[in-house]
Structures are given as C-alpha cells and as structure tokens.
Amino acid sequence: MLPTSVSWSLYLKTFRSHLLRAPQIVLKRMSSSIDISKINSWNKEFQSDLTHQLATTVLKNYNADDALLNKTRLQKQDNRVFNTVVSTDSTPVTNQKSSGRCWLFAATNQLRLNVLSELNLKEFELSQAYLFFYDKLEKANYFLDQIVSSADQDIDSRLVQYLLAAPTEDGGQYSMFLNLVKKYGLIPKDLYGDLPYSTTASRKWNSLLTTKLREFAETLRTALKERSADDSIIVTLREQMQREIFRLMSLFMDIPPVQPNEQFTWEYVDKDKKIHTIKSTPLEFASKYAKLDPSTPVSLINDPRHPYGKLIKIDRLGNVLGGDAVIYLNVDNETLSKLVVKRLQNNKAVFFGSHTPKFMDKKTGVMDIELWNYPAIGYNLPQQKASRIRYHESLMTHAMLITGCHVDETSKLPLRYRVENSWGKDSGKDGLYVMTQKYFEEYCFQIVVDINELPKELASKFTSGKEEPIVLPIWDPMGALAK
C-alpha cells in the first residue's frame, strides 16, 4: 500500500535511510528482470486493442512524423500575420549548412539589420567565417588553459573527461560572440566568405583539431606532474601548441585578410544603385556600421529549476581568455515575452536560444508543441519544463532570431512570433518560421536584450555587484548551445 500524502515525506526519509544502511540488499529487492511470459501477456493485451491495431498498422507503413502530423492544427498555426515587426527585411536568407555556427549566424543576422539600414542596402551579410576562424583559434587556447587549471583533478574526473570530449566544437553563446567582436571586430562577407570543406562542413576539421588537442592535453598534464616543470616550461609548451594549432587551421582556411585594427576597403552598391567605397577597420566597422556596443547586451533565461531573479553562471564556459563569462538572469516566461515585444517595438530583432528541432515542422516552418498527435497512439508527454531539463530531455541546442510577433490587443501578450532561421531558404517558408507562444514558453530558454531595455530592478542585478550568481557546471543543459 502506498503511503498517504500526509506521511509521504516521512516515508521518503525512511526509504532513503534504508538505502544508505543496506543499499545492495534494497537494490536487489527492487531489481526486475524481463519476464518472457509477461511479454506474451502484454502482446495479447495490446493486440486486442483496436486503437493499438490501427496505430501499429499506420506506423509500420508510414513515416511517423507524416502520419501523426495534425494538419488541422498546422493550418491553424501557420499564420504569417504579425502586427509588430522590425522595419528592415533581413536578406538574403543565410545558411550555416553542415556546421554548428547557429549562434554566429543569429548574432550577425541581428547586427546586419543595422548595416542594411545604415548603408541603404538591399542585401548584406557579415562574415561568419571571419569570427569562426578566430573562435576556433581562441577555443583551442581556452581548452589548453582549462587543462592546466584542472591538472589537479584525476584524468577520469567528470570535469576532465567533459573537457576532453569536445575541445573545440562549433557551438557558442552570445557572450562568446561578444568576446570575439570586442577583440576582432566584424567585416563584410564579401571580403571573407565560407569554404566548402571547413566552415560549411566542419566535421573533419574538428576531428583533426580534437585529436591534436587531446595529445596536447596529455603533454601538459604530464609536464605539470613533473617537479621540474616550472611556469616558463608550461608557457613555452603552450606557445608551441598555439603555433601548431594555427598551422593546422591555415591548412583548412585562408587567414583573414585584415587584422582587427588594420584598414580594409569595401565597395558596394546601395538600393538606389549608387556605388560607394568604405575604408574601415574590423573594430570600427562593428561599432560604426553594425552599431554594436558590447557593453549593453545581456542574456536572460527561463530555467524553472532555479529561483527567478537570480543570476546564473556557467562555470568554465568560454572562448577568449580574459573574456566575459557566460552569465544569465533567470526570469519567468511572462517577463521574457514582454521584453521580446518591447525590443521589437523598438525596431530591434531578438537573439534567442531554444531546443531545436523539438516540435518543429521544417517543411512548413511551424513551431508548435501540439503539431503531432502523439496522444492518438497512447504516447503522452507529462513532464514539465524543469523536469525535462533535469532529466536531459530539454536543453538549449539552437540559436535563431525573432524579427516579429503578433500581440493580442486585449492581453497585450504575444500569440506568435516570426523567426528567422539560418538553414537556407528551403527550410521553413523561405527560411522563416512561425513560433507559437506555448512553444516559446516550453522550449525557448534564452533571449538577449540591451540592459537599458530592462526594468531597473532587473538591470541592477547585472550592475550592482552585489549579486552572487548560482554557478552551474560546464555540462549543464543551459550551456549546451556552446556544444
């Protein structure tokens, strides 16, 4: 008999104490091997159910995504009318292809709206490859630094094993984007475009870099264990490793054509077909034309595992040594939604991080948690957002851009959002998606706004210096966008 709600806490306490006293005995009692006779019984039970028979007939003959797609729901949610949109069209549709650069695309797509407006352009892209090159170089060096700082931990520790698992993946966070732009600036894509076997298809390149970095990790850990390995020896080793990583990178990518403070010349034709010439440095281009002030953007998340109104920091996550840490302010969904609307009303697009491609129909470009009729086959999804995060069912995997929303006239809250993706024009409807409010609440985790767009009580969390952040480990789902 199960305990009543009144005695439930006492029951759990007693249960845990039994586990601690005799874990092997208790676990043995709770073990349950598969009973073949029960399989036959279960099969008879399910096969006698007409609903189960219909479901299995359909799923054995058709693709599950196609068969369970609720087309009535799809048609209802595929509404492309938005009463709050940014004034500048973001063209052309970008395509990250077979790379994990979504964060760089979402961030540069946001800033290119400023360039399009400032220079009266019809089409424009910032060079994602320029930032990608330096991100790889910086991440490799950041990894080596993490190996040195964790040298006191056992090689089999969770931290060291996590660091070794993927030293220099393509992913990243908005604060990591800011770290790159502050150091290297921005340039037009016309000056430094993608390459087919490195930037747009990075798997092999990543594999070779990873192998070399793991070798370097062993070298550093071995040297640090030797008493004779003073600081100068480690620094010399690090410089040799940096040189070799740069050499490997130069095999796969051209070196960026200009240094951050070096002047480049860019010619372009505006909407009126007038020819212009710009002379600028990458750092100047970022501030003057892309209108980026790196001190103003802040990240907010909705993570119901932790108290709202608290700062959250992802430990050890970064790319540029000495750069800003990954820090968010945790708020409720209503606050996130209102900030998105406010920013769009100020004619600014919103960088956001979500769990993609959960409940996303790539053919039509609709993101809605009720698109697929899973209950029709007896498959229900009762877990709440906090539980999904805890049990690794939800995590931040993809960054995109919100460029519009439709606000209800009565509640003043958004009903749906216009989303710009970076998977090319054949994904969604010409590269654009519509996201429902319910999807936003369940599978959107992060947005980026300017600190002056926050209410004073929220802005002060970032500026007061009195807030101690909740520190989450580098492998936490809230850091997964950087994978």
UniProtKB/Swiss-Prot annotation:
Protein family: Belongs to the peptidase C1 family.
SUPFAM superfamilies linked: Cysteine proteinases (SSF54001)
GO BP field: homocysteine catabolic process; proteolysis; response to toxic substance
Activity regulation: Inhibited by E64, a specific inhibitor of cysteine proteases, N-ethylmaleimide, iodacetamide, and mercury and zinc ions.
GO cellular component, as recorded: mitochondrion
Gene label: LAP3
Post-translational modification: The N-terminus of isoform Cytoplasmic is blocked.
Protein name: Cysteine proteinase 1, mitochondrial
The keyword Transcription regulation belongs to this UniProt entry's keyword annotation: no
Domain of life: Eukaryota
List of catalytic residues: C102, H398, N421
Gene3D superfamilies to which the protein is assigned, alphabetical: Cysteine proteinases
Propeptide: 483
